């Protein structure tokens, strides 16, 4: 039974792999037997992720996916892969009236356009094996709920959700699946470096029926499931994992 969840023999590209969810996804994919290709902008942190992976044959490609050129160079350097997990992203909280076009460009280039361009280039350059799996890391802020100052961030994640559904239809003839993982708040370095104090964080956790935030490795487990052959009949789906938050 457990073999159906194995990633042995699969090559998986993980973006945003230098920390947080991306690092955890790479670690769990490697633990499940995958050969991982890690990409992000920070080489030192990528090497730290690489050193933490089980198994051999993993590699690193430093790339800035917020630019067209960075995406093209990355895809040109890739072998054919069996899966892509798009984890690259930033979180910024800012009221809409205080934003300008540079804020729009930064968030959309990093959170949405990087993933969209990556999949476009991978398809155009024929870097996806038949029956590959593409997984987008979205957020409940994109489709399920909003928060003050989250208009741009939510818009970027909503864009990924819409892209996933249409692209799933487009790639279905090649048996390539496209799905999203839609988490609530996850404990990552991004959260640790936020301006929210410990008391506020504890109060916010109590709004979750399971009384805690998610862990990055839990997103990693879910990514492994969606990359595995256990989900060969799942595409265009948004898999919600939010500790029950949106039940409220």
Residue ranges and their predicted role:
Residues 18-19:
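Conserved glycine-rich cofactor-binding loop
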Residues 119, 156, 164:
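Active-site helix of classical SDR
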Residues 124, 169-170, 232:
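Alpha-helical segment proximal to the catalytic Tyr-Lys
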Residues 139:
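Residue(s) in the substrate-gating loop at a strand-loop-helix junction
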């Amino acid at each position: 039974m457990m073999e159906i969840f194995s990633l042995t023999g699969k090559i998986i590209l993980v973006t945003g792999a230098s920390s947080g969810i991306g690092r955890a996804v790479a670690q769990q994919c490697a633990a499940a037997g995958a050969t991982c290709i890690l990409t992000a902008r920070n080489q030192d942190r990528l090497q730290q992720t690489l050193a933490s992976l089980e198994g051999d044959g993993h590699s690193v490609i430093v790339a800035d996916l917020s630019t067209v050129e960075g995406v093209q160079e990355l895809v040109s350097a890739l072998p054919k892969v069996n899966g892509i997990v798009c984890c690259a992203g930033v979180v910024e909280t800012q009221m809409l009236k205080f934003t300008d076009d540079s804020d729009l460009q930064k968030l959309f280039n990093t959170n949405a356009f990087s993933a969209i361009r990556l999949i476009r280039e991978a398809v155009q350059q024929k870097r996806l094996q038949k029956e590959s799996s593409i997984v987008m890391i979205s957020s409940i802020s994109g489709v399920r709920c909003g928060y003050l100052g989250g208009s741009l961030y939510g818009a970027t994640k909503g864009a990924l959700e819409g892209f996933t559904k249409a692209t799933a239809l487009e790639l279905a003839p090649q048996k390539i699946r496209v799905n999203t993982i839609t988490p609530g708040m996850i404990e990552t370095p991004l959260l640790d470096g936020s301006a929210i104090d410990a008391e506020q964080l504890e109060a916010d956790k109590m709004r979750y029926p399971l009384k805690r935030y998610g862990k990055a490795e839990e997103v990693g487990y879910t990514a492994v499931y969606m990359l595995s052959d256990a989900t060969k009949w799942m595409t265009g789906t948004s898999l919600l994992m939010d500790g029950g938050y949106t039940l409220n």
